[in-house]
Amino acid sequence: MFTASPMSLSKILARRDWENPGVTQWHRLPAHAPFNSWRDEASARADDNASRKRSLNGDWQFSYYAAPEQVPDSWVTEDCADAVTTPVPSNWQMQGFDTPIYTNDTYPIPVNPPFVPAENPTGCYSLTFEVDEQWLESGQTRIVFDGVNSAFYLWCNGKWMGYSQDSRLPAEFDLSAVLRPGTNRLAVLVLRWCDGSYLEDQDMWRMSGIFRDVSLLHKPHTHIADYHAVTELNADYDRAKLQVEVALAGEQFADCEVAVTLWRDGLSVATVSAKPGSAIIDERGNWAERLNVTLPVKDPALWSAETPELYRLTFALRDGQGEILDVEACDVGFRCVEISNGLLKVNGKPLLIRGVNRHEHHPENGQVMDEATMCRDIELMKQHNFNAVRCSHYPNHPLWYTLCDRYGLYVVDEANIETHGMVPMSRLADDPRWLPAMSERVTRMVLRDRNHPSIIIWSLGNESGHGANHDALYRWVKTTDPTRPVQYEGGGANTAATDIVCPMYARVDQDQPFEAVPKWSLKKWIGMPDETRPLILCEYAHAMGNSFGGFAKYWQAFRNHPRLQGGFVWDWVDQALTKKDDNGNAFWAYGGDFGDTPNDRQFCLNGLVFPDRTPHPALFEAQRAQQFFTFTLVSTSPLVIDVHSDYLFRQCDNEQLRWNIARDGEVLASGEVALTIAPQQTQRIEIDAPEFAAAAGEIWLNVDIVQTAATAWSPADHRCAWDQWQLPAPLYIAPPVEGTAKPDLKVKEDVLEVSHQSQRWHFDRASGNLTQWWNNGTATLLAPLSDNFTRAPLDNDIGVSEATRIDPNAWVERWKAAGMYNLTPRLLLCEGEQLAQAVTITTLHAWESNGKALFLSRKVWKIDRAGVLHGDVQVQVANDIPQPARIGLSCQLAQTPQTASWLGLGPDENYPDRKLAARQGRWTLPLDALHTAYIFPTDNGLRCDTRELTFDTHQMQGDFHFSLSRYSQQQLRDTSHHHLLEAEPGCWLNIDAFHMGVGGDDSWSPSVSPEFILQRREMRYAFSWRQD
């Protein structure tokens, strides 16, 4: 039995355990399945709060020091004079101590493993708690820390109890020897840096403290020490065996018996009792303290992410008189995970992984996760058709897995290992001195989490190269848990240490032949000789800011190539932290905003949702691409569609198809049909379409699938899938528009003035621009209508380029080098002509930089008898410059419209390579809703393929993209944070005939697909504009 140490604090610290990779713990108890230590079966079955598990969360005393050596020896027994109250769990950086540091892969400390800086911020926590004599005499008392970053020492009642590192797994200690009836005192010394920090180089905020739950756990003297349940299914999946192993501990275990019972809806399905003692396993005998039992189950309800059917399994330990000593319990899901014929399968069905990577992040609480936030994340994921989550890049809070079991998500559980900043990356993975530390991070994860049905894949970690340590750990996991595959991307994504080819940021059709670790195109990879494993991207579609272009291409490939089984989007939530400015106003901060160095700026903003879980527009693109129903227009006369269910296990029993036929947004007919589609089957639906009269406008069939009743993760009427098709319509001949008076041209010294009834247009003869437009005496322009060839750079345009490290290959650097952000117009022609029924103004501009013409823009403006301004624009692009971001026009309007209405793609922001989620229709939104508040400001708010646009007195027609914003492109370009943007007078209107895609395969290299780059060197467009 462990005896608490009387050594002083300074003597214990003098050993510098935190700089010894061979020391990962002192006196920490072995890993096991989570415990609650119920004392009756009913409570365990109901998962009620256990009276013998007491939370120690709450207010603790806290003192902060710059280094552990500064902590006085007396702190072990009494608080320091400067102690303050701090909440546990929390990160101390979020409580006003020390600095949070955001870096992607650069280590935040000098790289000299296993040594860390002498200046090593140290947090000293203390808490007093009460226990009575009966509690102490009736069993063992343990303390459980679910997460402490990065290493800590523990004292109780002045006695040193132990040490632990690995910030993302529990550390459990036996306090029994030092507890006393009445008041007891805990003291926890937490170090910011330890040698384990070299294994925790994940792309995240680097923070410290006791950031997960702390609890006291009371176990009887003889108790359950571990349990493990494995489900086995027959080939027809209608018979199951539940193989259960239970380990006991304590002096009297041999006299005890364990009743193992499987429950379903409160009823016992199967039960068996057994005494400890395993079968003989070798020449030395058996495990005396273990027992193995089998529970047969007929017609089991199978678990999947679609149908998260759960049973409850209880383990009741009884003494020789039949009295219950200890009860543990867990949820059980009957499911089989396997790889066969090159496919990852659950219950015999090949999966299509609709996955996302998720960091544990909260804008106010840092890395502290509460149940409400976890539930919200899962609900949003399921509402947007995700079925899988990767715990990037560490084991999560224990509750997360229980929620995934119950809501239904497939989980990749990942070890807390990343050495991204090492050179080479595999330096520690190939060093046997680091094998114990790496081993504990993998083995303890498996032993804690292996009972969860949601976990279908183990991951050995992230971006740590590939070394002999990985091979050893792979073999241990496969031996310990042969029921799950193992994945690991490091070393090229297809080493012998992975059952799944799991690259990150491989592209659909483009090879990236990096030296040593090439990334082949997805289609090529699965066809390579001797490669028979499934391919699932562990990271793809880097959703940084205004990004996610080309996501539909991935999903086309996934649906067309069975061994391309999906992937995990990077990533779920923008990792911004709430900070207050000098005026006390809160804003979302990113790398560098806390004075943290080194830092990687806004590279932490890669989420599909904002920090408060408000969706980015990209989330809707994922929802549409990943939807579980596909549609086919079979015929238009009669009007027939097929609806196919991609569900593998779910019978449609809560879905309804709602359809309407609309002309330019006006509904002509509608209806609804109940869906009764079996898994992977199709339902044919004939729609009673009316005869269409000849009229202006396009006719569209719109179909939505909605859930009629609320579910555990969605409200009633939640739309889970949709599609639309343009239908043939009778030819319509529009009558000519007749005006009452022809426009009049006046050639003045400085302007060409066109008048028509209550309207006047001024074309400046020096600039050639439309500088003012009066309507009923009101000036409508604050800045002239002028050519627009650039955009406020997106994160994907910037790539890794920054002031101290220019990437000449980044789009923004290529545009800068060509002079596109410093264009000067030179007017070559400006003339007006009075026609019989109209006035035309013709201009020709050369847009130059450093005396070189980059663009030629010829515009012919025509004002007709109806007072409509028609624009016909031809643009030539120089052959030796990079392709531009846009071809269009921009102006600043004098009025600020309250709303805008348009006929085109909407309602949400969409771009040419990210418009799968956009729907053709007529939409109306407030002006502010047309702006996307990306934390790092960029071009935003575009709506594509617009036929009509109406706001205030303005009406525009044509085929164009538009954005309306309170902020100019220049301000968006110059401003570092969204909260620093200042609304400008009026409103900025951008009309684009052509706009480059946003890209998104990754955010550090040009990733816009060729078809979404403006390759043509001559372009022409036209539109009309009128005011009422």
From Swiss-Prot:
Its EC number is 3.2.1.23. It catalyses: Hydrolysis of terminal non-reducing beta-D-galactose residues in beta-D-galactosides. Optimum temperature is 37-40 degrees Celsius. Stable below 37 degrees Celsius. The keyword DNA damage does not apply. Its cofactor is Mg(2+); Mn(2+); Fe cation; Na(+). InterPro entries: B-gal_small/dom_5, Bact_Beta-galactosidase, Beta-gal/glucu_dom_sf, Gal_mutarotase_sf_dom, Galactose-bd-like_sf, GH-type_carb-bd, Glyco_hydro_2, Glyco_hydro_2_AS. Pfam families: Bgal_small_N, Glyco_hydro_2, Glyco_hydro_2_C, Glyco_hydro_2_N, LacZ_4. GO terms for molecular function: beta-galactosidase activity; carbohydrate binding; magnesium ion binding. The keyword Magnesium applies. SMART domains: Bgal_small_N. Optimum pH is 7.5-8.0. Stable between 7.5-10.0. The record marks W1004 as: Important for ensuring that an appropriate proportion of lactose is converted to allolactose. HAMAP family: Beta_gal (MF_01687). Homodimer. This is Beta-galactosidase. The gene is lacZ.
